[in-house]
Amino acid sequence: MLKWRAAARTDAGCQRQRNEDNYYMSPDQRVFAVADGMGGAVGGAKASKLAVEAIEQQWKDNPPPQTDRDAIEKWIAEAVNSANDAVWQEAEDDAAVRGMGTTVVVAVQADGDFIQIGHVGDSRAYLLRDGKPMLLTNDHSVVQEMVRAGRLTEEQARINPYKNLITRCLGHEEKVEIDQIPVDVKAHDWIVLCSDGLPTVLRDEQICEVVSKKGEPDVVCDELVKQTLDGGAPDNVTVVAIQYIDSDNGSK
């Protein structure tokens, strides 16, 4: 059976006084989440914290199934909806944080060679395989909609003044639409979850190069954050890295 190991890091970056990102990694390394909050100095951090706490509570109350793909997809939907409810309700109850919201990307690892990804907003999931990066998620953002429509190139999107304007997030509506992606993985693959602070600075190929050279999830996370900081890090940056290894090695 395929094994895996994981690590996570977060940093406020070079230009932000407060870190509005949050992440979660369950003790059994089966549930992972990254959330990137928005809504002012207090609201953004609170929104992302509420989101990951709701996902953590879902794991505690009802851990995800380990083999049934449909049931895992349903579990992610329930967890993300619970996170949306938490942010939405807090914003309704507290005028000081009204309008706050957060992105989220969630991954649930099944037994063996399968992981399910769910996301809302522009936090991302990558599959890195054989030295090549594959973006698994489609950003819910104005600029990426323009890229998909052929109105902007990826290079133009990187410098577009509206690149941080998202079209979907947790907490802005009572109900939220969740995109999900099933991913079959194999030994030597990596899954990387991140807030948009990472790809704002590092290109996909640079992310893949770090993963290929560093080898251990904690070292990979440290190096990705370091290179982002070296590149100016205008935003908070958060990374979760999951490494898949042969069954005779590793921790899971």
Language-model segments: what does each one mean?
Residues 1-252:
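PP2C/PPM-type serine/threonine phosphatase catalytic domain
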